[in-house]
């Protein structure tokens, strides 16, 4: 599955921009057999993962996800949604809004989706993208699979497409190498699930090998709308 994340930061009113984002999700219509899957998420006000603001990544007002099924290109979906996206972008701070496009892979799926955790991960100095992603996809993913109480996904960035979209929309290209996604119905399942302490220790130790943790960003969101056109 190919996917785009738009980490939207409102220029003035979060509420006004969010209403326009809801309109994009709820009023768009399929044309010529193009059926993108759209999702809208808002960060939790009391996020237990302690989002730390940073110069490189502003806390988003909301996040829009645009996805196409395997074998279906994203470009027709973008053309379909472009009028609504253009209207939405007028309300966003384009110097803080970021986009990331990539290949989405499902590792563990049971249908949990009320809360969605994103971890935008940066590679450690000395690692090329190929080095980083090779280690992640073939080794580090074991910790996400072993985490109890969650569904687990990865989106690996397509740097060329991400930069192209950033230029097209006048926003910032995300510098993260990937987005680690954990979906859950209750954040306590992740915080206090049986065996989570041991998995967390192993994951943190492994990340020290290849992840630039101080410049990576994590936060949890509430899914408020999802629709396939």
Language model features by range: what are they?
Residues 1-229:
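Macromolecular interaction modules
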């Amino acid at each position: 599955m190919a996917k785009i994340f738009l980490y939207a930061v409102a220029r003035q009113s979060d509420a006004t921009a969010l209403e326009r984002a809801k309109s994009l999700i709820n009023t768009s219509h399929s044309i010529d057999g193009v059926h993108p899957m759209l999702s809208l998420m808002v960060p939790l006000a009391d996020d237990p993962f302690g989002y730390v603001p940073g110069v490189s990544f502003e806390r988003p007002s909301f996040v829009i996800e645009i996805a196409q099924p395997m074998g279906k290109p994203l470009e027709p979906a973008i053309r379909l949604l472009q009028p609504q996206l253009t209207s939405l972008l007028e309300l966003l701070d384009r110097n803080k809004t970021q986009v990331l496009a990539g290949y989405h892979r499902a590792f563990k799926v049971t249908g949990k989706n009320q809360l969605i955790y994103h971890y935008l991960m940066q590679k450690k100095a000395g690692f090329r993208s190929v080095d980083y992603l090779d280690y992640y996809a073939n080794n580090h993913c074991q910790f996400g699979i072993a985490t109890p109480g969650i569904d687990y996904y990865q989106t690996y960035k397509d740097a060329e497409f991400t930069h192209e979209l950033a230029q097209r929309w006048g926003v910032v290209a995300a510098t993260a190498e990937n987005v680690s996604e954990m979906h859950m119905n209750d954040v306590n399942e992740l915080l206090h699930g049986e065996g989570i302490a041991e998995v967390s220790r192993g994951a943190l130790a492994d990340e020290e090998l290849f992840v630039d943790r101080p410049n990576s960003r994590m936060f949890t969101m509430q899914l408020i709308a999802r629709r396939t056109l």
